[in-house]
Amino acid sequence: MSKKSFLYINLLFALFFFLPGLQAREKTFTVVIDAGHGGKDPGARGSNINEKEINLAVALKLGRLIENNAEDVRVIYTRKTDRFIELDERANIANRNKADLFVSIHTNAVKRGSTVQGTETYTLGLARSEENLEVAMSENSAILLEDNYQQRYEGFDPNSSESYIIFEFMQNKHMEQSISLASEIQKSFGACKRVDRGVRQAGFLVLRKTSMPSVLVELGYISNRQEEQFMRTAAGQNKLAEALYDAFCKYKKNYDRRKGNISGVVAAPVANEETPPPGSEADILNKKQQATRQKTSVSSTTSVNRNTKGK
């Protein structure tokens, strides 16, 4: 055999064994991260911060973790700034980009002064409890801020329990994968010492129109003073983002195993403490949160001084 023929055979051998793996790696996995509410829709209101700010901060941190550690994943955000986006457009963004996964990030609330706390992850379905229905009603009420919402959502009334009957008859072919991701998310939250309130189902419009595995995450209760304080700090937001990233890694590895792909996900995330570039969305958001904390601190100090003088 000539030297030239020998090299040719070796080349074919290498292509036969390694090209399939390379081709599998070339398939980009797309995840859409949806920061709930925004712009004229503040979401749930806390004492010192609105839901929309927490959602955006955690969404950007989660996206950055994936971008820094998962080379075969494309991250798309429904919003990276404080702006209002219609619920159906959030789903459309995922569908247009042929996303493999949709994660909508929210913050829960009940009546002020409540001690209810903990994380929940929802998949699409009929709410089996009054509590789940109330959460869905709260999140779906964002459509009331949209133009022509009655036409856009075919007469759906977010405040009417009758409107939610349609979800009982909806069959979602991605339900199994959605529940799998939701379960991993709740496990990760439990591992970082958050109260695990479980995987639940409810009729969320933003999940109804997506054509891929989808979940809606409630990070905690902004109506609970301790949880609000945790969620408004950079350290708390980092922990929540890292828990979501950990769950994403496990889901993605299972996905790659089923598809026969080579996973490009790194399990241990790079620290999310880096300083964002000046003028970036994350930098502007950090400055707003710092200003709010300083204002609150000054207000508390003034109040204490007044009380001391009055004694």
Task: Give, region by region, the residue ranges found by the protein language model.
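Flexible hinge/switch segments at interdomain interfaces of large molecular machines
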Residues: 152-161, 216
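Bacterial N-terminal signal peptides that target proteins for export
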Residues: 1-9
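Polar/charged, compositionally biased leader and regulatory segments
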Residues: 162, 289-294
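Active-site-adjacent mobile loop/cap segments within catalytic or ligand-binding domains
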Residues: 43, 162-265
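Bacterial N-terminal signal peptides
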Residues: 9-18
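Catalytic-core regions of hydrolytic enzymes
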Residues: 24-156, 171-175, 179-183, 238, ...
